[in-house]
Every structure is written in C-alpha cells, then in structure tokens.
Amino acid sequence: MAVSELEVDGVVFPPLARPPGSAHAHFLAGAGVRGMEIGGHFIKFTAIGVYLQADAAVSALAAKWAGKPAADLASDAAFFRDVVTGEFEKFTRVTMILPLTGAQYSDKVTENCVAYWKAAGVYTDAEAAAVDKFKEAFGPHSFAPGASILFTHSPAGVLTVAFSKDSSVPESGGVAIENARLCEAVLESIIGEHGVSPAAKLSLANRVAELLKGAAHAGGEPAAEPVPVSV
C-alpha cells in the first residue's frame, strides 16, 4: 500500500519525513487533532502527526499484528504500546492550531509523566533531571498557529526535541535528552491508553492495519503517494 499525506484541520502532513539528525526515512502512520470540550464546544489546540521508521516498523509490528482488522488494533492498548516501545525510530510532529507558550506545553506534558511515574514507583533522580532538561528546551519558545514541535524517539531511549516556525522539518539541531522513560512517555501521552488524541490513534490503527496487510501480500515497505485523504 502506498502511503498518502493527511490533512488535519488545514495542517498537511506529508507521506514521508526525515527527523532532525536521523539517517532514516519515516512514513506517516497516522494523524489527528488534540482538543477538549469547553463550554459545550470542541476546541482544537494542535494537529499531531505520528511517523514510524520505514525500514523497520512494518516488519517489527507484522509478527504480532498483521492480518488483524483496524478495529482490533484501535481498541487494543497493547498495539499502541508496541508502537511506543518498538525497536524502531518514531517521529512526532505537533503543529499548533491555537497559540501556546513553551512553558504551557512542557508543564502539561511533564506533569502527567511525573504523576504516572510516581504512581508506578519509577520516578528517580534520572527522570527528574530529564524533566528539567525538557522544560529548559521549551522555556524560551512561544508557538504561533502553524508552528511545530518535533520529537524524535530513538529506540535507544534518546528523545530529541526540535522546533520549527512552520511545518518544515530541519535537517539537524534540537536538544537530545537521554532518558528512556521520558522518550516513551511523550509518545505514550499522545497514542497510549489515555492518549490526548483519539483521532490520531484511530488514524494510526487504520493506516497501519492496511500497511501490514499490504506488506504481507507484497513483502515490501510502504512507498510514498502524496494524495490527500481524510483522517
């Protein structure tokens, strides 16, 4: 199956991307909005695209999930956990729909992470230091609509944080944070069991199910086909 681009609330996610500092191309696995019901209205804050390493993700996920319908993947927390923890790179692009400060974003993300780690009894000095470095990376930034936050999640447990004033992806740069729990937690907060973007989760389940089906038949990796489709 060819991989198409997705448009989410006017934000276009191309079918392929190469994260800052990565040697690997990534395909668009899914995309959707993050929003919240406020006063009876659904307010959209960000559009989120999740990319997976093209030369490793499909084969890694196929062993357990190939042949299963999208509905099964979408309803199974273990599938999303396998995406988060899989031995392949992931790349997440968060593009603003409404303006947001770096402090607002980083405080909310780390607040949820720390609460989870403390409840699980795994919050150590290493996690505290990683959280501080994460907040420092965001401190001087404010994000206008259209600006993007870029996360590269390494299977070695390194989270690279970069920024763009638009939807472009810089070839290099960013802040590298070596902490496996934080690296996983950022993606887990988006597509995990209590992920903030159900739309991105559903999109990812639908597209990966088709890719696994196509890979099983063709024995190959996804190719790019830049044709807009709905989420």
From Swiss-Prot:
The record marks 105 as: Important for catalytic activity. GO terms for molecular function: chalcone isomerase activity. It catalyses: a chalcone = a flavanone. Transmembrane segments: none annotated. Pathway: Secondary metabolite biosynthesis; flavonoid biosynthesis. Keywords: Flavonoid biosynthesis, Isomerase. InterPro entries: CFI, Chalcone_isomerase, Chalcone_isomerase_3-sand, Chalcone_isomerase_bundle_sf, Chalcone_isomerase_sf. Disulfide bonds: none annotated. Substrate binds at residues 46, 112, 189. GO terms for biological process: flavonoid biosynthetic process. Pfam families: Chalcone. Its EC number is 5.5.1.6. Catalyzes the intramolecular cyclization of bicyclic chalcones into tricyclic (S)-flavanones. Responsible for the isomerization of 4,2',4',6'-tetrahydroxychalcone (also termed chalcone) into naringenin. Belongs to the chalcone isomerase family. Part of the biosynthetic pathway for all classes of flavonoids, a large class of secondary plant metabolites, many of which are brightly colored. PANTHER family: CHALCONE--FLAVANONE ISOMERASE 1-RELATED, CHALCONE--FLAVONONE ISOMERASE 1-RELATED. This is Chalcone--flavanone isomerase. The gene is CHI.
